[in-house]
Amino acid sequence: MKTVLLVDDDNVFLLAIGVRLKSLGYTVCTCKDAAFAVSAVLKNNPDIVVLDVSLPAGDGFLVAERLQKLPAAATTPIIIVTASENPELPERAIKAGAVAFLRKPFDAAALANTIETALAQGDDRQPRAKAV
């Protein structure tokens, strides 16, 4: 069973997406704060992280960049999500190390498909080099 860490400060999002992912057979862990996101990754060792951009105590881009520097998390795929319409965010997400970017609101099936695609890339992932 694969583990997904959802990092978002929206309780409704965490509940709705968490229930859907659990129904698909995933183990789901949650975190609501950028300050605890890195420790949540190290503690739970998820197979993938779904990370919101706007978080208390920081932003998802900084969390993604921190994870890229940790040997224990450098190959963990990250999907960055946001409700912002800023057109620069998808490129910024990829530069921060994300494998995918989704704009809220999105269908839970779209997230599940994105997770499956990222996980299907296999265990031969190399640490993602930070884009310059």
Report the location of each language-model feature.
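The feature encodes the CheY-like receiver
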Residues: 14, 56, 86, 105
